[in-house]
Amino acid sequence: MAKHQPDNQAQFRRFENFTELTHTLVSEWMHLIDDASQSKRTAAFALAGGSTPAPIYRELDQALAQRATANVLLTATDERWVHDNDPQSNEGLFKKCLSQSVGKQWHLVSLKNAANTPEVAMEAINERLQKQLPERFCAVLLGMGADGHIASLFPGAPVQADGLDCLAAVHPQTHQTRISLSLPRILQTEKIWLVITGNEKREVFENALSSDLPIGNLLKQAQCQIEVFWCP
């Protein structure tokens, strides 16, 4: 069973393993989707990429596919500037893990276009986000790096650009170009799910409020419910 303990404004939820974590999170996720459906609202979510949340998305896909209809919009919290058939593409990951329900129960609001660089694309992507997404997400699912980064908001780098909902980013080690939701846009949500594993990341999280890391800034500025889903 999950154990609950408060951690400042965040609720820290400990699970014995990732399977248990996944079942709990997907159940909560489907409740949000069903609530939105009953009230005739669009359920919009921003999702982290990477290998860690992939099992969550596969289980969500199975649950969504059992619904006759669902008005769900998904967008990435950040995306590498690669084609969506590239193994490193977050949007490609979503389409693969949520393959049964894509185009039926959910639709993608993409962070990419045909521009050569995210810097060139930013204003057009910002316009797309503002036109196609509701003002607030139902929830944002975030991961966190051991360096305290979230989405593609890295330590010491900007977290917003000219009031836009997105910004160009560069990975500090690989120098790979990316596009990311800005911190203010990430915070426009009813709820944040932070999914982390291992003791190293737990320690980073526990010390975040006394830091200037992106995760620390998120915790300090958030006006919404934050749930941390953690397992060893």
What are these regions (language model features)?
Residues 2-9, 69-141:
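Ligand-binding beta-strand-loop-alpha-helix segment within the catalytic cores
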Residues 59-68, 92, 155-163:
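A glycine- and small-aliphatic-rich helix-loop capping segment at beta-alpha/alpha-beta transitions
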Residues 47-52, 142-146, 197:
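Glycine-rich beta-strand-to-loop/alpha-helix junction loops that act as flexible
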Residues 186-232:
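C-terminal functional extensions of proteins
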Residues 120-122, 151-156, 204-208:
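A short secondary-structure junction signal
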Residues 142-184:
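Class I SAM-dependent methyltransferase SAM-binding "motif I" and its flanking Rossmann-like core
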Residues 37, 41-62:
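Glycine-rich N-terminal segment of FAD-binding domains in flavoprotein oxidoreductases
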Residues 1-45:
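N-terminal glycine-/serine-/threonine-rich phosphate-binding loop
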